[in-house]
């Protein structure tokens, strides 16, 4: 009987050790699954925040640039009024009332465009900026810095800082050096 008790004592501690190892392995496996689930949950929360942020940005851009097509269409009207004023004689008494009406209409258009963050680009004398201006021609000029805008054919416009229409310009270039004449060479 003592032998049986001793055998039982020897077997009993080993069984809990095997079960403990199984439980430890199971706990470790569950902890890994929990960590993976927590990581996945964090990623999903981050993805949701990114989607929400992108949606808010899209709505903001839609509000900001909803007027783009409409404002672009109005620019032709502004251009026509400006050309009409340029072509008319300010000293002609017969058209003075019509000219004043055109000036007031143009001022109202300009004020309205400014109210909706449509900004005119009139770059005469400024350095050429290919992101905002379109060069229609190059002209030699001794008085202007090479690469600067000499003349504006058509003003450009920005809507909330974004290019709506580039300014059509003439850009200056350095005068060509004249070759020495035959008399100078001799």
From Swiss-Prot:
SUPFAM superfamilies, A to Z: Coiled-coil domain of nucleotide exchange factor GrpE (SSF58014), Head domain of nucleotide exchange factor GrpE (SSF51064)
Region (Disordered): 1-20
Alphabetical UniProt keywords: Chaperone, Cytoplasm, Stress response
Any one GO molecular-function label of the UniProt entry: protein-folding chaperone binding
Cellular localisation: Cytoplasm
GO cellular component, one term: cytosol
InterPro entries noted in UniProt: GrpE (IPR000740), GrpE_coiled_coil (IPR013805), GrpE_head (IPR009012)
Source organism superkingdom: Bacteria
Main localization of the protein described in the UniProt heading: cytoplasm
Entry-linked Pfam families: GrpE
Subunit structure, as described in the record: Homodimer.
Name of this chain's protein: Protein GrpE
The species this protein was found in: Pseudomonas aeruginosa (strain LESB58)
Record lineage: Bacteria, Pseudomonadati, Pseudomonadota, Gammaproteobacteria, Pseudomonadales
